[in-house]
Amino acid sequence: MEQLIHYVWKHKLFPLTGLKTTDGKPVEVIDPGLHNHNAGPDFFNAKVKIDGTLWVGNVEIHDRSSDWFLHHHEQDANYNNVILHVAESIDADVRTEQGDYPPQMQLNVPVKIREHYDELITTDNYPACYCIIPDLPKLMIHAWMSALQVERLEQKTDAITERLTACNGSWEAAYFVTLARNYGFGINGDAFETWAKMVPLQSVDHHRDDIMQIEAIFLGQAGLLELPAIPERYQQEAAKDEYFIRLQQEYRYLAHKFGLHKMDAHQWRFLRLRPQNFPHIRIAQLAHLYYQRHAGLSQLLECETVKQAKELLATQVTPYWETHYMFGAESEKNEKHLSTSSLNLLVINTVVPMLFAYGRHKGSERLCNRAFDFLEALKAENNHIVRMWKEVGLAVETAGDSQALIQLKKTYCDKKDCLRCRIGYEYLKKKDA
């Protein structure tokens, strides 16, 4: 596997003595070079002594040396300055576009490293590397978790940047879409993002003092003010529900006024959702959040503490929704506040990324640092990923820790990308008991 040979070369996980080219000249690897993930040779600026002469240049690596021709390197001038061609199997001499014949060296992946790699790739255990966790240096774990935390925030920043582009450069709109997506709490995230992009925030701004008109726009754009969007068993009651009828009337007027086009209600998912998580309730909560514009981006950026951020996002619903989960379905009175765990998730997945992304955009180290401070101030999320890592002996205390582990699982573990993981590196070079 070429990727594994790359890894062994990069980290010099091979015997450093006794190396020779195919024509018997001694080789000393001083610096394996900088790993290149783009077009061109695999490693730039390597330093290699061949037969006592120091060479500085590029190194190319393959499973078989004949892969050089398979990839047409003999026709590519980028490979003219290759100082060493490394392969696990030497089955052909190679030449450059200039007609030179770079020296070749056979490099076998050490047996133990290959065995350990196969263990990581083939096991059904999660985490695959669980057996070495208790023995890892705390400093190494801390450094890797910190890097993963930054990586996750940068990934979320990329998503916000894409939304910013889709929203024609409006940070307020990008924030609204991000907040709405996270109001889906996973199962309806995509639907909420689709919906948020169809909500005309500037139009909502003109009606921010009228909660019914905000609800009409929000629920109408979600396609939830249509009888077919209501379960059949509730349709008869909904058809004569005064609040439902009034919202329909308001929406028809506002849709005509602003030229609105609603989304398809079939995109919303209800299966296995608790009633308090129904889209109607979440949208009603968002409507109240934007009532009198209490929770815009400017207010968010003013939050200096997690407590202030949670107070900003804490919301309620209108009296109608205190006794309904959907139109035509009356229930016992419940004020339907967001739970503490829901508010924590909104801070983690909305507030923190927005502070970081906006801070990056404005070059504000203060906002970026505040994002990390918020993650350190919140307790770790309680999900199956966190629980499994705790079971194997990893200390998971803050939201920063849990976000790092989510990044680790989704970006590395799920893709079996152990060669890019620092824990995977430790596993590969571990000594068997």
Model-derived regions: residue spans:
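Catalytic micro-motifs at enzyme active sites that drive phosphoryl/nucleotidyl and oxygen chemistry
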Residues: 32-37, 45-50, 68-75, 90-96, ...
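An acidic- and aromatic-residue-enriched active-site/binding cleft used to recognize and process polar
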Residues: 62-66, 89, 110, 426
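Acidic, carboxylate-rich catalytic segments that either coordinate divalent cations
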Residues: 391-433
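N-terminal ordered "arm"
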Residues: 7-66, 79
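Hydrophobic, aromatic-lined core segments that form the binding pocket/scaffold
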Residues: 149-404, 417
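Compact, glycine/acidic-enriched structural inserts
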Residues: 80-82, 86-144
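N-terminal "leader" segments that precede or initiate the main folded domain
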Residues: 1-7
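Mg2+/Mn2+-dependent nuclease catalytic core
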Residues: 64-86
